[in-house]
Design a protein with these regions (language model features):
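Bacterial N-terminal signal peptides that target proteins for export
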Residues: 1-2
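C-terminal motif of bacterial Sec signal peptides marking the signal peptidase cleavage site
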Residues: 9-12
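Acidic-basic catalytic patches of nuclease active cores, encompassing PD-(D/E)XK
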Residues: 14-52
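Non-catalytic C-terminal interaction segments of nucleic acid-processing enzymes
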Residues: 20, 24, 37-38, 68, ...
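Acidic helix-start/capping segments at beta-turn-to-alpha-helix junctions
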Residues: 55-63, 117-123
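Alpha-helical scaffolding within the catalytic cores
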Residues: 58-64, 97-102
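Catalytic cores of nucleic-acid endonucleases
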Residues: 78-142
Length: 160
């Protein structure tokens, strides 16, 4: 009888099983580019559409936004682009945590500095209310902060 009472007490005190995290997805590339452009305006840079930068003899990185008259910009890299670039895009160093990833081009693009932002770093879920874990606003603010930090460095170091 005592065993049944203890078992009933333990069952009543047990918590619900842990639930799986909400499925997430990255910011849409068009929205990400809008945020990048706004960050350029915030830092008093003139954003213009970017162009491809040679990373390897047969592979180019599409830069989404560059500063007018300068050789620095931002590339929002999607899964498709990562797949196409393969090993031409240097791997991120896990020891660096969430440090910004900068790449330079080859040849004529050798002095170009590009901030590579991976879509997988800007995830959100579609849930609302208390079920919401990763908001769109949080992902957008993180992207804006990362671009702003890059631009502050570009200005401080007087990049071409």
């Amino acid at each position: 009888m005592l065993v049944l009472a203890l078992a009933a007490g333990l069952w009543a005190c047990s918590s619900a099983p842990p639930r799986a995290p909400n499925p997430t997805r990255p910011l849409d590339e068009r929205r990400a580019v809008e945020i990048i452009i706004q960050a350029f305006h915030d830092q008093r840079d003139r954003p213009v559409p970017g162009q491809a930068v040679q990373l390897a003899p047969s592979r180019k990185l599409e830069v989404d936004v560059v500063a007018q008259g300068r050789k620095y910009g931002v590339a929002y890299v999607t899964a498709r682009e990562r797949s196409e670039l393969g090993d031409a895009l240097p791997p991120r160093d896990p020891a660096m945590g969430d440090a910004l990833q900068l790449v330079s081009g080859l040849g004529a693009d050798g002095d170009a500095r590009v901030l590579v932002v991976h879509d997988t770093d800007y995830l959100y879920d579609d849930h609302v209310g208390e079920e919401h874990e990763d908001t769109t606003v949080t992902a957008e603010l993180k992207l804006r902060r990362d671009v702003r930090d890059f631009l502050v460095r570009a200005h401080a170091e007087r990049w071409p």
